Amino acid sequence: MAFVPFQAPQGSTIAVGMSGGVDSSVTAYLLKKQGYDVFGIFMKNWEETFSSGYCSAAEDLEDARDVCQTLDIPLHTVNFVQQYHDRVFQLFLDEYRAGRTPNPDVLCNREIKFAELALYAQQLGADFLATGHYAQRLQSDNHEAALFKGVDAQKDQSYFLHQITPAQLNKAIFPLGGLQKKQVRAIARERGLTTFDKKDSTGICFIGERPFRAFLQQYLPAQKGLMKTPNGEIVGEHMGLMYYTIGQRQGLGIGGIAGASEEPWYVLEKDLSNNVLIVGQGDHPLLYHRVLIAGQLSWLNEAPIAGRFYHAKTRYRQSDQKCRVDYAADGRLQLTFEQLQRAITLGQYAVIYDGERCLGGGVIEARMQGKQDVSS
């Protein structure tokens, strides 16, 4: 099947999700330059009163206004605070409470940006919603929309978009997918957009620059417990299982163990029933798994074919990992990797790729040490 770049029909009205950053700024500029009827929308998803600390929403809105004024396009604002709290943030808390590590940015794209924001854009007369994501929307021979990686491998964001629905993708445009980040900044500078040198946002949007532990403590009471080795030896005390992720090295505070080597300590497992953090040193075997099970599956077009080999990512910016796709009796996805995978984390997403094309994926719910041969 052949795929070609998608071009919105001339005369289309396109809404741009304006974040106040350089990517959405250049997205709006490029679309207007191409002759489309463009307007911006700035959405507010978080209420500053929900938590103490600094929130950049006010500054971001001012930056979005400056850019839209420079480009001479209208800017609308909309409040999705309640929707975000109910459909993204509450699940984020539930997952951490259950000892898993969620990715709220994936949920925000599916539940808010390409659902609530897209609907609001449509009500304002938009034919399409454009965002500053580094991903590509291509079109197949039979005119189906397909999601491909952005050409900038360091910035590709198809991982965060894999849970959107085919209907949502059909109304989405990603003008930056064929550009490098440095090209985007250069365009912004040449056009005189005030966001050309604005720092990229990092981390979870509603946490900002605050320490993660301090933020989470406002919502989930911490229960301290023991750190133990797989053999049951007590080596320290943890501050609450929710604060730790599989493979974590920093912040464990383990030292001076008699008879222990100088190798660093890592989080291996979480024993939820006993409130125990299992830790080990160096490249411990419990850090590595060959098989994972994923549920809550979402496919952009057709599902991967059982028994075939694809590539997968189990976290953002991971290099593609070759794996065989199978399905468990209950319909969940089973991936068997060619190479052992380090620190597969429950609650994160396993995303499947066929070459550069993103097929979709699901939430990692289990992992196994499986040793079976999966050579193709």
Swiss-Prot record:
Its EC number is 2.8.1.13. Residues 155-157, 315-316 are annotated as: Interaction with tRNA. GO terms for molecular function: ATP binding; tRNA binding; tRNA-uridine 2-sulfurtransferase activity. InterPro entries: MnmA-like (IPR004506), MnmA-like_C (IPR046885), MnmA-like_central (IPR046884), MnmA-like_central_sf (IPR023382), Rossmann-like_a/b/a_fold (IPR014729). One of its GO terms (cellular component) is cytoplasm. ATP binds at residues 17-24, 43, 132. This is tRNA-specific 2-thiouridylase MnmA. It comes from Dichelobacter nodosus (strain VCS1703A).
